C-alpha cells in the first residue's frame, strides 16, 4: 500500500482547503485501514482499527485515521446525531468555540444553520472573542458547543455566565471539559508551566476539573444533564466506536425547556 510521506503531508496541508484535505484523508484511511471492526461516527467511516493518540501516543486506538477524531469527538458526534436536534434543520444560530476541524466542515453544511466559530486568538475563526466577554446580546444563540476550552480560562465562572446569557430560553449547549479529579483543583497563583502540568495535567491548564463540574454550570443558571457514554452509545457499541466509557456529555439548557425534557426522558 502506498504511504504518504511527511513532506507530501505538509504540502497537502498548505495547499488544500480544509474540507478537501479531510476528504482526501478519509479516502486514504479507508483504503489503508480497510475493515469493519471500528466505526467513527464523526466521519461515518468503517475501519479495521483506530490509531494511537494523545500527546505521547500513549492511548492505543484513540484517533480515527480518517478524520482525526479522538474518543471525546466520537462520543459528541454520536450524541449530536442520535440524541440532539442539531441536524434537524430550520433557521437557527450556533456558536462554536475553538472549533474542531472534524466538526466545523459538517456544521457549515447544515441547512438553515447560522454557524459562527469563535476563539480568543485563532486567526482562522470567524470572530475572535473572549469567552468571558461575548460581544453578542442576551438570548442570541439557539445552540452553543464549547469543548475543552474552560480549563484554559482564568475566570471560568464568568465565562459560563456569559454562555448562559447569550443562549435563548429554548436553546441548548454542550459544554465539555476533561474531568480527572474528585473535586475541582485550582490555584490562580500557579503560573509556572511545569507546576501546571503537575497539578492540572497540561502546561496551559489553569485548573483540573472534578466530578463537581456540573455544580459550576448550575451556579450560572443552567439546567444540567450529565449523560454517561454508555447511555448514549449502549454497552455493545462502546468498543467498536472507540469511546471512553467514563466520559460524560454535559448537556445544558437555560431552563427546563422542551429539549431538556426530551433528553431527560431518554435517560430514564
Question: Model segments located where?
Answer:
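Conserved N-terminal segment of class I S-adenosyl-L-methionine
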Residues: 2-135, 235-268
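S-adenosyl-L-methionine-dependent methyltransferase catalytic module, highlighting the catalytic core
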Residues: 25-38, 154-163, 168-268
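Hydrophobic beta-strand segment of the Class I
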Residues: 97, 144-145
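Alpha-helical membrane segments in multi-pass integral membrane proteins
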Residues: 143-144, 163
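Short catalytic micro-motifs in class I SAM-dependent methyltransferases
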Residues: 147-152
Amino acid at each position: 500500500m502506498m504511504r504518504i510521506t511527511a513532506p507530501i503531508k505538509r504540502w497537502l496541508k498548505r495547499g488544500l482547503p480544509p474540507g478537501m484535505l479531510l476528504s482526501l484523508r478519509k479516502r486514504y484511511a479507508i483504503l489503508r485501514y480497510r475493515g469493519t471492526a471500528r466505526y467513527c461516527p464523526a466521519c461515518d467511516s468503517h475501519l479495521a482499527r483506530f490509531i494511537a493518540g494523545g500527546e505521547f501516543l500513549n492511548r492505543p486506538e484513540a484517533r480515527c485515521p480518517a478524520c482525526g477524531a479522538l474518543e471525546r469527538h466520537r462520543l459528541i458526534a454520536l450524541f449530536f446525531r442520535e440524541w440532539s436536534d442539531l441536524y434537524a434543520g430550520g433557521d437557527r444560530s450556533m456558536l462554536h468555540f475553538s472549533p474542531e476541524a472534524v466538526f466545523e466542515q459538517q456544521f457549515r453544511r447544515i441547512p438553515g444553520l447560522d454557524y459562527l466559530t469563535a476563539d480568543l486568538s485563532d486567526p482562522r475563526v470567524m470572530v475572535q472573542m473572549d469567552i468571558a466577554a461575548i460581544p453578542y446580546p442576551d438570548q442570541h444563540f439557539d445552540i452553543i458547543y464549547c469543548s475543552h476550552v474552560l480549563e484554559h480560562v482564568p475566570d471560568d465562572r464568568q465565562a459560563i455566565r456569559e454562555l448562559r446569557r447569550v443562549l435563548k430560553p429554548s436553546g441548548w449547549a454542550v459544554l465539555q471539559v476533561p474531568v480527572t479529579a474528585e473535586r475541582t483543583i485550582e490555584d490562580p497563583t500557579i503560573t509556572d508551566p511545569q507546576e501546571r502540568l503537575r497539578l492540572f495535567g497540561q502546561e496551559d491548564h489553569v485548573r483540573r476539573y472534578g466530578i463537581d463540574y456540573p455544580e459550576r454550570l448550575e451556579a450560572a443558571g443552567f439546567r444540567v444533564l450529565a449523560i454517561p457514554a454508555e447511555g448514549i452509545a449502549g454497552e455493545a457499541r462502546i468498543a467498536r466506536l472507540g469511546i471512553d466509557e467514563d466520559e460524560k456529555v454535559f448537556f445544558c439548557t437555560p431552563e427546563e425547556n422542551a429539549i431538556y425534557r426530551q433528553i431527560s426522558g431518554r435517560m430514564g
